[in-house]
Amino acid sequence: SSLLSKLKIKDNGQIVISLLPGSRKKEVQYILPILISVSKLLSKKIRKPILFLCQVAPNQEKLVDQILKKMPNEIKIVHKHLLGNELTSSSDYAIITSGTATLEYALNGIPSIALYKTNFLSAFVGRRLIDMDKIILPNWILGKKYMDFIFQEKCNPEYISEKMIKLIKDKNKPNELLVYAKKLRDLLTANDKTFKENIKNIIEAKLNF
């Protein structure tokens, strides 16, 4: 792909897995070490070569660099402000810290897993104030489970790796997700309105249901 050539990485037909540790400091601190461990487990358990590309938000470059240096890994960095969109289209799979990126990857039909981990108190309060089914935008908009969401206690390298291996082995999943991606695009481009307007209308309609 053009992204690999820009990153000066040889395309050997490897599986490309995007890692998105989030854009907030606490997210990166909690989640990036987990993603590094996941990358090591997947490299051991999957025979085909894997290329892990980590998307880094502009405000977290220093922190990401510090964490990556502390934990030996084979992860390559992709700067969001330079190549973020190309990373999405070049990915075979993704592991995403929940947020708007879940919608971006869903619209591209990329098989993905969403996850989130925070401190105990924030998780405790969050579970009581937020409907967990509504955290992942594509799931909520489509009204069905498009993307697995792994939260808090289950957000550990072993469990995430198991889920990713299952996703990679499911040969029907990419075609299935492309169908859902079209449904999402149709919903979000309806009535000649912008994505933003349609997302706002869909969310308001669901909240008022």
Regions found by a protein language model. Give the residues of each.
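Nucleotide-activated sugar donor-binding and catalytic core shared by glycosyltransferases
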Residues: 1-209
